[in-house]
């Protein structure tokens, strides 16, 4: 957020609204951004209607905080069967978006066929944000519970999937998926199905494969350690610079 504030006015060419921002609104948005409080559209100072006009992807961290609060008060107390039921319900929300069902009539302009969104304080964007949060969060929690109950001396991870060189195989699958962000055009049923399969099936399988694989050589271990230490400190720090492109 501070990096975004420092470079905020340098993006005036792409976002003319930034040059007309009064000091009081700039300051208020900065304080709210630092406190991880989402700004309403009336405080949008860039023109994209984001939670945080200085660093748009911060919306994902806001939803992560909501997930942590739900975990602290509700999810951690639930048995595995209840988590499984909730996970199935939230999988439906994901399919509602990716397959364009719009069961609740939230999208008057037509089907989504995608999970893109979640960064504005509108009914549609909040629905997308919670749909993106809940299934992965609950699925990860359910996997953790199941694996912990399966651990043994011969299978310390509890995972049913064990791959030799699992780190490299999982990394390769992720690179392939990220290299193909959509198929059949940017919108449509084919792309929605592709996104649903990745979210609901492929990513959980990658988690299972990763948790069941052990790095035994120094090279893989050092790469894992380096990426792990680098990933969170650098998360979304690049985005303020992208605004200026």
What label would you give each PLM region?
Residues 1-65, 94-123, 198-211:
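Membrane-interface helix-loop-helix regions
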Residues 79-84:
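A short alpha/beta connector and helix-capping loop motif
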Residues 85, 93, 100, 150-153, ...:
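Juxtamembrane helix-loop transition sites at the ends of transmembrane segments
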Residues 6, 90-92, 142-143:
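Hydrophobic transmembrane alpha-helices of multi-pass, membrane-embedded glycosylation machinery
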Residues 39-48, 74-78, 118-245:
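Alpha-helical transmembrane segments in multi-pass integral membrane proteins
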């Amino acid at each position: 957020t501070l990096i975004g504030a420092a470079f905020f006015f340098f993006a005036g060419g792409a976002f003319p609204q930034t040059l007309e921002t009064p000091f009081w609104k700039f300051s208020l948005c900065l304080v709210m951004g630092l406190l991880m409080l989402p700004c309403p559209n009336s405080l949008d100072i860039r023109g994209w209607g984001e939670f945080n006009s200085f660093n748009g992807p911060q919306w994902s961290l806001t939803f992560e905080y909501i997930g942590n609060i739900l975990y602290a008060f509700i999810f951690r107390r639930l048995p595995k069967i209840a988590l499984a039921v909730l996970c199935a319900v939230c999988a439906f929300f994901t399919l509602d978006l990716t397959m364009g069902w719009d069961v609740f009539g939230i999208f008057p302009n037509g089907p989504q066929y995608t999970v893109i969104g979640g960064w504005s304080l509108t009914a549609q964007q909040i629905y997308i944000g919670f749909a993106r949060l809940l299934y992965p969060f609950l699925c990860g929690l359910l996997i953790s519970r199941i694996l912990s109950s399966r651990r043994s001396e011969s299978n310390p991870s509890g995972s049913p999937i064990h791959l030799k060189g699992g780190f490299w195989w999982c990394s390769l699958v992720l690179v392939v998926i990220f290299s193909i962000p959509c198929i059949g055009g940017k919108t449509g049923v084919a792309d929605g199905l592709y996104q649903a399969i990745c979210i609901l099936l492929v990513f959980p399988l990658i988690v299972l494969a990763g948790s069941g694989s052990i790095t035994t050589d120094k090279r893989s271990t050092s790469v894992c350690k380096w990426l792990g230490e680098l990933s969170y400190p650098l998360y979304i720090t690049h985005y303020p610079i992208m605004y200026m492109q």
